Amino acid sequence: MLSPKRTRFRKQHRGRMKGISSRGNRICFGRYALQALEPAWITSRQIEAGRRAMTRNVRRGGKIWVRIFPDKPVTLRPSETRMGSGKGSPEYWVAVVKPGRMIYEMGGVAENIARKAISIAASKMPIRTQFIILR
């Protein structure tokens, strides 16, 4: 699973996901890509599940780039805990994804293989996505 080696602060505010993505919204590395259409937090487990599914489907020859990185810690309190006594401890990491952001990119394979692999990865995502081809 992906996570930062070290961060400046252990805990973060939740923040807001307003507007569309201004960074990472173009295809840079491959020829095909999976683009987010909704804002969401995508966990490191979901990113890894999608990457594994794509790798299994493409086998050799294709190259996959993961364009998002989970750098935001999400804290959870222990169950059945009373209110107060501070913020919970960090449990997992998420990537903040806005609409328009490329999640995965792929190259070195035929379009039909890429479409199939990316659709399998898209089913692992908690948001609506679309398949994009570099023209």
Swiss-Prot record:
Annotated GO MF terms: rRNA binding; structural constituent of ribosome
Domain of life from the UniProt record: Eukaryota
Keyword field: Chloroplast, Plastid, Ribonucleoprotein, Ribosomal protein
CDD domains for this protein: Ribosomal_L16_L10e
InterPro entries: Ribosomal_uL16, Ribosomal_uL16_bact-type, Ribosomal_uL16_CS, Ribosomal_uL16_dom, Ribosomal_uL16_sf
GO cellular component, one term: chloroplast
Main localization, broad class: plastid
Keyword Lipid biosynthesis among UniProt keywords: no
UniProt keyword Plastid, yes or no: yes
GO BP terms in the entry: mitochondrial translation
Location(s), subcellular: Plastid, Chloroplast
Known partners and oligomeric status: Part of the 50S ribosomal subunit.
Sequence similarity: Belongs to the universal ribosomal protein uL16 family.
Protein name: Large ribosomal subunit protein uL16c
Gene: rpl16
